[in-house]
C-alpha cells in the first residue's frame, strides 16, 4: 500500500445530512483568526476539499470539516467547514457534527448530563450546550451568529423556470429560499427528481452572490396562521431558518428535513447587522457517528482530487 496525504476522519450524519470531520493528519495553518485560516485553506489547500467531497470519497450531499486549534482562548477548538462549492463561515449541521465528534471520541471531556463549551467557526464564536447520556451526545444546542433577511419576495429569472419569487437570508452564509408551491411541487422524497432542477439554478444565484438554495413547504400553522413547522428539500437540517418576521422571540420552531428528521430553532434576542434588523437563534439537533476512516492518495491514482460525473452531479 502506498498512500500519501493521509488523514483520519470521523463520519457522521446530523438528521441525515453527512458531516465528515477530519481529526488528524492536518497541521495548523497560518491565520490570526479562524476566518483567515479558512481563506488560507481556500487559497492553498483546496485539493483537500475536492478530494474529500468528490467521488470516490464523497458524493453531492457530502460535507467535511477540519478541526484546528482555536485562535480565541475562549474556544475549546476551531473548525473549518468545507462544502461542495465553497467554504462556509458557519453551518448548523456541521457544527453539531463537530461538537458530537469532539465529545464522543474523547477529544473533549464529556460531562453528563450537560457539557458546555465554545467552538470557533470562521464566522465567530459559537456556544455549545450538549446533552449527554451513557457516553452519547443526545442533543446539541448552539447559539448561532446573528441572522437577517436581505430580500423578501424578490423576483429572479431562472433558466427553464422563468420568474421565481424568493427570499434571501443570512444565517452563517447566504440562502435563497423559495416556496415549493410556486413550482407545483411538494417537498417529499418522491418529488426529488423534479425538485432538484428548481433548487439548483446556479448561474443566477452566483451572479447575485447567493450560495445556497432551499425549497420550503409550510407543514403546520398556529391560530394566527404562522408556521410552526417547515419542511424543506435537504437530507438533514441546517441553520437556514425562515425569515418573513412570522416568529417571535422564545418560540420554538420545528424545521423538518425531507427524511422527516427535525431540528428545533428558537430566536433568543434581537440585534442589528449593519443596516439590517437581525435575530440571534439557537438551533438544536442530533448527530450520529457512522464510521471512523483513514483517507489518502495513491501516487499512481489518475484522480488524486476525485471526480464528478453528470449522472448525479
Indicate residue ranges for each PLM-predicted region.
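A glycine-rich beta-to-alpha transition motif near the start of alpha/beta enzyme domains, typified by
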Residues: 1-167, 176-313
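Glycine-rich ThDP/TPP pyrophosphate-binding loop and its adjacent helix/strand module
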Residues: 172
Amino acid at each position: 500500500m502506498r498512500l500519501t496525504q493521509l488523514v483520519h476522519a470521523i463520519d457522521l450524519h446530523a438528521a441525515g445530512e453527512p458531516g465528515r470531520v477530519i481529526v488528524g493528519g492536518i497541521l495548523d495553518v497560518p491565520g490570526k483568526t479562524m476566518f483567515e485560516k479558512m481563506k488560507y485553506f481556500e487559497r492553498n489547500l483546496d485539493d483537500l476539499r475536492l478530494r474529500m467531497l468528490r467521488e470516490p470519497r464523497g458524493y453531492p450531499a457530502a460535507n467535511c470539516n477540519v478541526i484546528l486549534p482555536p485562535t480565541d482562548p475562549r474556544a475549546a477548538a476551531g473548525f473549518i467547514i468545507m462544502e461542495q462549492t465553497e467554504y462556509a463561515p458557519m453551518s448548523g449541521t456541521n457544527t453539531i457534527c463537530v461538537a458530537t465528534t469532539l465529545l464522543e471520541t474523547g477529544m473533549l471531556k464529556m460531562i453528563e448530563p450537560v457539557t458546555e463549551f465554545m467552538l470557533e467557526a470562521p464566522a465567530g464564536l459559537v456556544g455549545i450546550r450538549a446533552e449527554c447520556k451513557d457516553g452519547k451526545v443526545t442533543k446539541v444546542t448552539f447559539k448561532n451568529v446573528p441572522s437577517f433577511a436581505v430580500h423578501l419576495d424578490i423576483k429572479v429569472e431562472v433558466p427553464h423556470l422563468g420568474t421565481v419569487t424568493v427570499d434571501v437570508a443570512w444565517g452563517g452564509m447566504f440562502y435563497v429560499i423559495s416556496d415549493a408551491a410556486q413550482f407545483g411541487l411538494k417537498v417529499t422524497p418522491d418529488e426529488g427528481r423534479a425538485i432538484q432542477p428548481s433548487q439548483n439554478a446556479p448561474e443566477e444565484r452566483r451572479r447575485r452572490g447567493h450560495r445556497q438554495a432551499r425549497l420550503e413547504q409550510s407543514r403546520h400553522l398556529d391560530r394566527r396562521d404562522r408556521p410552526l413547522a417547515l419542511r424543506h428539500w435537504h437530507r438533514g437540517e441546517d441553520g437556514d431558518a425562515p425569515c418573513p418576521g412570522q416568529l417571535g422571540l422564545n418560540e420554538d420552531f420545528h424545521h423538518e428535513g425531507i427524511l422527516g428528521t427535525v431540528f428545533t430553532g428558537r430566536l433568543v434576542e434581537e440585534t442589528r447587522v449593519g443596516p439590517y434588523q437581525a435575530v440571534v437563534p439557537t438551533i438544536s439537533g442530533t448527530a450520529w457517528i457512522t464510521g471512523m476512516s483513514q483517507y489518502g492518495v495513491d501516487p499512481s491514482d489518475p484522480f488524486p482530487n476525485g471526480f464528478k460525473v453528470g449522472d448525479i452531479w
